[in-house]
A protein has these predicted regions:
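Acidic/aromatic-lined carbohydrate-recognition and catalytic surfaces
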Residues: 2-186, 190, 203-263, 270, ...
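Hydrophobic "anchor" residues on beta-strands that sit immediately upstream
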Residues: 94, 98, 195, 252, ...
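Short acidic (Asp/Glu) and glycine-rich catalytic loops that position anionic groups and cofactors
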Residues: 217-220, 286-287, 329-334, 439-447
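Carbohydrate-interacting/catalytic domains
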Residues: 1-55, 82, 87-88, 361-364, ...
Length: 561
């Protein structure tokens, strides 16, 4: 495998709107990010991914871009962005941005021109189609609910939007449009950007027949991803995208890819794959309900363990995945993946250890490093997220009570991850001096950066030790390129794997069960590298031991001989 500059890096996702507000408007900004670069450096972060900061009406929190060449004034100026790039470079850190090119905003000048002339040049930048007998061209349900087709006023035409109606899909069959997108991407890379996280990219290839599918709900519609799955040829578009942009700059790219078959992995992340890496959503997909959040199944430990370890085995033959516990589109991992008895600092450290030491590129989401959890929501009116409001309506339509629908949103809403970063126990968690754009989690006085900075045994300081171990001179090679070998898969409540190469063998073993567990080693302990219950130097595990006892929520990382 050809070695790349990003293989041994640790990444951190910032949701700018909720990170830190420095100008008192209740919204996070670029100046806030600049002011916290040293904090991120102290965590061991190499790559910072910024969720969208482009000019936008913010119907979908910036994933509806109205100008690809401008910074949203809510976040700051292009000069401040350039300063961020320069300050990151001084610290040997890389900035990547969200790249949203499946769709744009309905306020983008291309779409505005298309609306004025639905038969003109710019209409072909989108998917305008005639309706059928007064109905939309096909029966697709958008990802946010309702038809994927929106009527163009005063005409018999509709335009396609797989997300909100304010997010018209771009027509990737149009070569002129593709070239304009490539020019824009290269403009940012020329600025000094190190790469992109690429949003919803599989959706760019449509089945141009737009066939109807069997309805899968009482609304008479079918999920739009069925149309995407029936389309062929996305690889050709992705290859052209890479060759015209990323490849020229040795840029780091991480794709948001769902519905991919295991046999397609080499094409996506192999030696000459479309992307540097793709996110591993195997655990997140376990809570996909048949109809949405309201019937999302509870995640079973054995299924979760099997999903992660199986994904590791199928991936390492070809390349790297980006490992996550949570992101801006998911609820908090501590609330989602840990049983109630483990939703404490020890359990949160345990979950972090298991994720960060997997083979692949770790992505830490803002607040994960202090153990932020889901918020308590008292009313649907407290939410901002467009998807949450849609799921609430869907739950009510399916017959759930308001209390049940609200509880489902509380478990799964994206707004759980979007509550403001908890910097201190001061008003609004130190995020802003104004009214925050989204409510602050009530637990901020107990869970915040300032308090954890002072506590050597905090989740934050544990994450620092964890990342430092992964990047240490002694173990960086092993944790980057070593194999991941599942272990103790038949032992109840135990999540374990070896990271090994020709020179070393390290066991990562965690007890997710509610009772003490005991395991017999294949070998003996040479050194304790990390423990979430004691300093490694003070560990009660003896060198030479051939058995390990783990309390509930205990994780050990040991060098084995």
């Amino acid at each position: 495998m050809e070695r790349k500059w990003w293989h041994d890096k640790v990444a951190y996702q910032i949701y700018p709107k909720s990170f830190l507000d420095t100008n008192g408007d209740g919204i996070g900004d670029l100046r806030g990010i600049i002011s916290k670069l040293d904090y991120l450096k102290s965590l061991g972060i190499d790559i910072i991914w910024l969720s969208p900061i482009y000019k936008s009406p913010f119907v979908d929190q910036g994933y509806d871009i109205s100008d690809y060449y401008a910074i949203a004034e809510e976040f700051g100026t292009m000069e401040e962005f350039d300063e961020l790039l320069a300050e990151a470079k001084k610290r040997d850190m890389h900035i990547i941005m969200d790249l949203v090119i499946n769709h744009c905003s309905d306020k983008h000048e291309w779409f505005q021109k298309a609306l004025k002339d639905p038969d003109g040049e710019y209409a072909d930048y989108f998917y305008f189609r005639k309706g059928k007998n007064g109905n939309p061209p096909s029966n697709y349900r958008s990802y946010f609910g309702g038809s994927c087709w929106e009527k163009v006023p005063g005409t018999d035409k509709y335009y396609l939007h797989m997300f909100a109606k304010e997010q018209p899909d771009l027509n990737w069959e149009n070569e002129k449009l593709r070239q304009k997108l490539y020019e824009m991407i290269n403009w940012w890379l020329d600025k000094g950007l190190s790469g992109f996280r690429i949003d919803a990219i599989i959706n760019i290839k449509k089945n141009l027949d737009f066939p109807d599918f069997e309805p899968d709900a009482e609304d008479g519609l079918a999920a739009c991803y069925k149309m995407v799955e029936s389309a062929e040829g996305v690889g050709e578009l992705l290859e052209e995208l890479k060759n015209n942009t990323f490849k020229k700059y040795d840029a780091f790219t991480v794709g948001e890819v769902f519905n991919m078959k295991p046999e397609e992995l080499p094409e996506f992340i192999g030696e000459n794959g479309h992307f540097s890496t793709i996110f591993d959503f195997c655990a997140q997909c376990l809570s996909n309900g048949e109809h949405g959040w309201y019937d999302a199944p509870k995640i079973d430990f054995d299924t979760w363990r099997k999903a992660i370890l199986s994904s590791q085995l199928e991936t390492e033959k070809y390349g790297f995945k980006a490992n996550i516990i949570e992101n801006h589109d998911e609820p908090r991992g501590a609330s989602r993946f840990l049983p109630e008895y483990a939703q404490n600092p020890a359990g949160i450290k345990m979950l972090g250890t298991v994720s960060v030491l997997l083979r692949g590129i770790p992505f830490i989401y803002q607040g994960q490093e202090i153990g932020m959890q889901n918020a308590k929501w008292n009313s649907i009116d407290e939410y901002d997220d467009i998807s949450t409001k849609d799921q609430y309506k869907a739950a009510l339509a399916a017959g759930l009570s308001k209390e049940q629908a609200l509880a489902a949103c509380g478990r799964m809403s994206r707004d759980n991850a979007r509550t403001p970063m908890q910097w201190s126990d001061e008003a609004n968690a130190g995020f802003t001096t104004a009214k925050p754009w989204l409510k602050v989690n009530e637990n901020y006085k107990a869970i915040n950066v300032a308090a954890q900075e002072k506590d050597p045994s905090s989740v934050l300081n544990y994450y620092r030790r964890l990342v430092a171990l992964r990047k240490s001179d002694e173990f960086k090679e092993l944790f980057t390129y070593g194999r991941c070998v599942p272990a103790y898969e038949d032992t109840d409540g135990i999540m374990a794997y070896y990271r090994e190469d020709e020179n070393k063998r390290v066991l990562v073993v965690a007890n997710f069960g509610s009772k003490e567990a005991q395991i017999r080693l294949d070998g003996s302990v040479k050194k304790v590298l990390l423990s979430n219950t004691n300093d490694a130097e003070k560990s009660t595990v003896s060198v030479g031991a051939s058995e390990l006892k783990l309390e509930s929520c205990e994780v050990l990382v040991v060098l084995v001989k």
